[in-house]
Structure formats: structure tokens, C-alpha cells
């Protein structure tokens, strides 16, 4: 198991990457178009459901990132799984500060943040990370949040 100092250093290093990797939670979907080139994604796929669409991208590391977009064009959820963490600062936007605060109080265990305005789950270990985040007020009517994974 990694020491908390090393884990915190890894989190800071990942979040300090020089490129924006993803559309931002709670923001307009328009930034997704440039994501593939910025994150050097090796594959991109979009799928439309009746109440939302999902944009999937695979990073060169093999990490899969999914962005869930409401019909109004707002990113209401993001999810990731793979050997490396994506750029969480870019993905979570203004919600990133809540994420960082929670990591300082929950070291060495999966992270769970749950409030009326934000839900984040992040866990894993070196070479195997997974998580998701969503904004409950932005989830389209009739969408089960369990699809955000």
C-alpha cells in the first residue's frame, strides 16, 4: 500500500498535467471536441440514449473516460477507469476543491463525497483506478445515476 505522502504527491502531480483532458463537469459539451487531440486519445466513441449521450475516450495509458451529457448540452457526469488517473482538476472544474478537501480527510480508503450538489467516488491503487462524479441537480429527469460508471 502506498504511503499517504506518496499518494498525495501522485494526486498533485496528475492534477498538474499541462493539458486539459476533458469536458468539465457542469459545463457545456463544446469542449469535448478538442479533448481527443489534447489528451492524445487513441479512440473516441459517442453513444446517444433517449435522455443523454455518452462520449467515451481512451487515453494512451489505456484509461477509459466517459462524459455524460444532458440534452441541454451540459456535462452532468464523468467516469473513469484504468491504469492512470485522468486530469481530475480539468474534469471536475469548480468541484475539484471539494475533492481535494475530501482526500485530505480520507487517506488510504476509497473516497466518497456526497452532497445535494455533488457526488464523487474515487478509488483504486497503482495501475487500477476507477471513479465517477455527477451533479445531482443536472441529471436529466428519468436517468438512473447508476449508469454513470
PLM features: residue spans?
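Bacterial N-terminal signal peptides that target proteins for export
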Residues: 1-10
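Intrinsically disordered, compositionally biased low-complexity regions
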Residues: 3-4, 60, 85-86
Amino acid at each position: 500500500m502506498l504511503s499517504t505522502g506518496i499518494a498525495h504527491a501522485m494526486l498533485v502531480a496528475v492534477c498538474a498535467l499541462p493539458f486539459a483532458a476533458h469536458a468539465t463537469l457542469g459545463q457545456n459539451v463544446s469542449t469535448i471536441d478538442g479533448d481527443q487531440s489534447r489528451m492524445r486519445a487513441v479512440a473516441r466513441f459517442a453513444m446517444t440514449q433517449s435522455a443523454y449521450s455518452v462520449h467515451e475516450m481512451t487515453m494512451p495509458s489505456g484509461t477509459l473516460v466517459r462524459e455524460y451529457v444532458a440534452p441541454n448540452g451540459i456535462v452532468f457526469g464523468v467516469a473513469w477507469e484504468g491504469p492512470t488517473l485522468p486530469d481530475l482538476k480539468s474534469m471536475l472544474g469548480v468541484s475539484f476543491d471539494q475533492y481535494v478537501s475530501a482526500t485530505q480527510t480520507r487517506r488510504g480508503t476509497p473516497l466518497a463525497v456526497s452532497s445535494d450538489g455533488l457526488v464523487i467516488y474515487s478509488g483504486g491503487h497503482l495501475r487500477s483506478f476507477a471513479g465517477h462524479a455527477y451533479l445531482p441537480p443536472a441529471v436529466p429527469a428519468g436517468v438512473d445515476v447508476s449508469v454513470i460508471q
